[in-house]
Amino acid sequence: SEMVESGELDAKYVHVESEHSARCCAMGASATGARAFTATSSQGLLYMAEVLTYAAGGRFPIVMMNANRSTALPWNIYGDQRDSLSLLDHGWIQCYAQDNQEALDMALMAYRLAEDPRVMTPVMVNLDGFALTHTYETVEVPTPEQADAFLPPYATTNKFDFDHPVNMGYSAGPEHNRYYKY
């Protein structure tokens, strides 16, 4: 948010009231053709579980960082992958970072993977809560030129087009459901 506020990052920062709303907002942004990102952890990830399947089913190439933390009860802020592992079959590609450099690198790789026309699937980058999220570690931040060379400009055909409307949120019977899920 500081980079957006200072103008260093050309992006919109949207403050929402919950993780459920954050996921819906990211889906809406992606549906209009914008590159979308959000982050969460633990109970927040479980709270947005309902709309994770909508993002996957809609083939929205959203990237989300998840600080892996234990789920309640008991409450704690330490690393535990129970939050993300409980959502393995929700249609998201999941990557697990070993250190903060990997987390940064995977964020860029996640966009490249998610936005590939052959993939068009959201990606969750997981990093250990507390061990990585609450400690300092030196990372090599790529220059904008390096990032641009690795990550092409975002251009998707999977977006709302008022001149060519499509049906989203449709129903699929048993004979077609497997095709959409797998």
Segments (PLM) and residue ranges:
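Conserved thiamine diphosphate
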Residues: 78-129, 153-154
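Thiamine diphosphate
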Residues: 1-86, 91-92, 108-109, 128
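Sequence-level detector for tyrosine residue identity
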Residues: 13, 47, 54, 78, ...
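Short, exposed beta-strand "edge-strand" segments with a Pro/Gly-rich flavor and a Y/T-containing core
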Residues: 11, 92-95, 137-142
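Conformationally flexible catalytic loops at phosphate/diphosphate-handling active centers
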Residues: 123-182
